[in-house]
C-alpha cells in the first residue's frame, strides 16, 4: 500500500467525514478507498457502452475560474456535432450549472463528457448515457394535421 497526498475542498472533506461517521468507518483512508473503488467500478460500467447513444451531461462550475468559460465554449464548438442543446443556470454569485443534451457514438460522447468534467474549475459533473440502437435519427414525417 502507498501513502499519497491529495488536496480536497473543505466542503467536500466535510461531506466525506460525515459519510464516514454515518457508515462507521474508522478513518478517512478507508472511506476514500471505498469511494475510489465505487467510482472506478462506475467508470468501467460506463465505458463498456458502445454504439449510438443520447446523453445528458450536467456539471456545476465556477464561472470566475480563470478562462474556464472560454475553454468550455471552445470545447463545445470543437464538438458541435455531439451537442444538441445546452441549458445554463446561474446558481449563485460564483456557480453556474449547465445541462447539455448530447447525441453520437458512445465512445465520442464519453470522451467529450469526461473532458468537460475534468476541466479545472468544474466542481461536479455527471453524464447519463442511453443507447439508441443502430437506427437513423428521427426525421419529421406527415402525421395527419398541420402545425401553424
Curated annotation (Swiss-Prot):
Residues annotated for Ni(2+) binding in this entry: 77, 88, 90, 96
One family name in Pfam for this protein: RHH_1
Keywords: DNA-binding, Metal-binding, Nickel, Transcription, Transcription regulation
GO molecular function, one term: nickel cation binding
BP GO annotations: regulation of DNA-templated transcription; response to nickel cation
CDD domains tied to this protein: RHH_NikR_HicB-like (cd22231)
Cofactor: Ni(2+)
Entry annotated with the keyword Nucleotide-binding: no
Keyword Transport listed: no
Cofactor note as given: Binds 1 nickel ion per subunit.
Function comment: Transcriptional regulator.
Family (UniProt): Belongs to the transcriptional regulatory CopG/NikR family.
Listed name of the protein: Putative nickel-responsive regulator
Taxonomic classification: Bacteria, Pseudomonadati, Pseudomonadota, Alphaproteobacteria, Hyphomicrobiales
Amino acid at each position: 500500500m502507498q501513502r499519497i497526498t491529495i488536496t480536497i475542498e473543505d466542503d467536500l472533506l466535510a461531506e466525506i467525514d460525515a459519510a464516514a461517521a454515518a457508515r462507521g468507518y474508522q478513518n478517512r483512508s478507508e472511506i476514500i478507498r471505498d469511494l475510489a473503488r465505487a467510482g472506478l467500478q462506475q467508470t468501467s460500467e460506463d465505458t463498456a457502452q458502445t454504439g449510438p447513444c443520447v446523453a445528458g451531461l450536467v456539471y456545476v462550475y465556477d464561472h470566475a475560474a480563470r478562462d474556464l468559460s472560454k475553454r468550455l465554449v471552445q470545447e463545445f464548438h470543437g464538438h458541435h456535432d455531439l451537442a444538441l442543446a445546452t441549458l445554463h443556470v446561474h446558481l449563485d454569485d460564483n456557480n453556474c450549472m449547465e445541462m447539455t443534451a448530447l447525441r453520437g457514438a458512445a465512445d465520442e460522447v464519453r470522451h467529450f463528457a469526461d473532458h468537460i468534467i475534468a476541466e479545472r474549475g468544474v466542481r461536479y459533473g455527471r453524464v447519463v448515457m442511453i443507447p439508441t440502437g443502430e437506427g437513423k435519427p428521427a426525421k419529421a414525417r406527415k402525421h395527419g394535421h398541420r402545425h401553424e
